[in-house]
Amino acid sequence: IGIGVPSIVDSEKGIVYNVANISSWKEIRLKEILENEFNVAVAINNDSNCFALGESLYGEGKPYDNMVGVTIGTGIGAGVIIGRRLYGGQFMGAGEIGSFPYLDADFERYCSSFFFKRHDTTGAAAAENARQGEQAALDIWKEFGMHLGNLVKVILFAYAPQAIVLGGGIVAAYPFFKDAMEYTMQSFPYRVMLDNVRVIASHQNDSSLLGASALLE
């Protein structure tokens, strides 16, 4: 059993810490619990790490030695691939980019579903309204793209990848925020790095599942 969880993890011991969406999960020995229950091997990692691993092995990241997979949904996180191997850092927390300070809060408040709550809407509603040509919705996506472009620049500074693969539910609306994101990226100071990185929207729905299964290989 391979599992991705939205939190930091002791991957060797299979301990899950501080799951944001499950407040009672402060320090859960999930690997031990599941192995005792099902009598099979269990591997646990951060969910964004699983996404990045899946994309690196089977998806848009496959051509690249060094890439970052970014999941955009109820929150935002990243998995880092260096030399075609997952780099998790201590407690698999290397890609917790949503917690980077930004403006009056952090990037998660501006580059995930939290952003749309600020505009009294949802990503799905904003996408549907944008498809209908509603200017207010198009403006919301333009602003979202600007914030995401600023986060991409941070990723370039931190990891200098060859590719950044975007995944998660919000990426279905990629055409509405792509231009604003790319425009904002143009202020990155190292032109040679900017010219040699690809930002790609994932077309796979099962990258995280594939990455979680690969934890056992």
Stretch-by-stretch model annotation:
Residues 2, 67-71, 77:
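Short glycine-aspartate micro-motif
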Residues 14-25:
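A charged helix-plus-loop insertion that forms the helical arch/lid used to bind
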